[in-house]
Amino acid sequence: MSKIIIACRDLYKSYFQGNLEVPVLHGIDLQVNEGEMVAIVGASGSGKSTLLHVLGGLDKPTRGEVTLLDRELSTISEAERGSLRNHALGFVYQFHHLLPEFSAQENVAMPLFIRRMNKKAAMEQAAAMLQRVGLGHRLTHTPGELSGGERQRAAVARALVTRPACVLADEPTGNLDRHTAEAVFDLMLELNHEANAGLVIVTHDTQLASRADRVLHLVDGMLQ
């Protein structure tokens, strides 16, 4: 039986504008097993990114619970949540969020530096991961010297360099042309399969989503 990596139960999320409550998520139930890819499809403004942020411990639910590697996030301290997030999760976004003043290799090594890995080992591991995503010849290049597809490949490498239990991807190909998007998506699937990690991807691209193990639709804050 596959291990449950990340799950939420009876999840609600609202934002408040003064006294006005703006509900975003309504009673979400979800679990993702190791090695499983789940695609969540929804229109802009449907709450996809909010759901991903709550699952990743970047935002707190209004009600309900989120469990990551059998630990309920609301029951642990902020420091413990940060440590668990850094060790168990990888994040990929539509915009690469690479640090412009650092090389591709240094950017990919950042999560390892946060883990206090020594610099030599971290840089070697980052170089190996960049080689794996086809950027072994671009180690010393800054993000400004990379193409859009190369920057997103570097972002994927950064998300996976720590060998996370689950990757949360928010429109990871939304800023790319179709050919490059498919190449980056193929790479994510291949690397995630090799690592037997969970993968949750939110997207409006139904063609790419159809390749997931499960496709869920977020409509009016509810999963269908």
Swiss-Prot record:
Q: Which residues form the ABC transporter domain?
A: 6-224
Gene Ontology molecular function terms on file = ATP binding; ATP hydrolysis activity; transmembrane transporter activity
Source organism, top-level taxon: Bacteria
The EC number of this protein is 7.6.2.-
Detail the disulphide connectivity of this chain as listed in its UniProt entry: none
Q: One GO CC term of this entry?
A: plasma membrane
Stretches that traverse the bilayer: none
- Cell compartment(s), UniProt: Cell inner membrane
Any single GO BP term: protein localization to outer membrane
**Coiled-coil region list:** none
Q: Name one Pfam family in it.
A: ABC_tran
Positions of ATP binding: G42, A43, S44, G45, S46, G47, K48, S49
Keyword vocabulary terms for this entry: ATP-binding, Cell inner membrane, Cell membrane, Membrane, Nucleotide-binding, Translocase, Transport
The membrane topology of this protein is: Peripheral membrane protein
Its function? Answer: Part of the ABC transporter complex LolCDE involved in the translocation of mature outer membrane-directed lipoproteins, from the inner membrane to the periplasmic chaperone, LolA. Responsible for the formation of the LolA-lipoprotein complex in an ATP-dependent manner.
Quaternary data? The complex is composed of two ATP-binding proteins (LolD) and two transmembrane proteins (LolC and LolE).
The record's family statement is: Belongs to the ABC transporter superfamily. Lipoprotein translocase (TC 3.A.1.125) family.
Q: What is this protein called?
A: Lipoprotein-releasing system ATP-binding protein LolD
Gene that specifies this protein: lolD
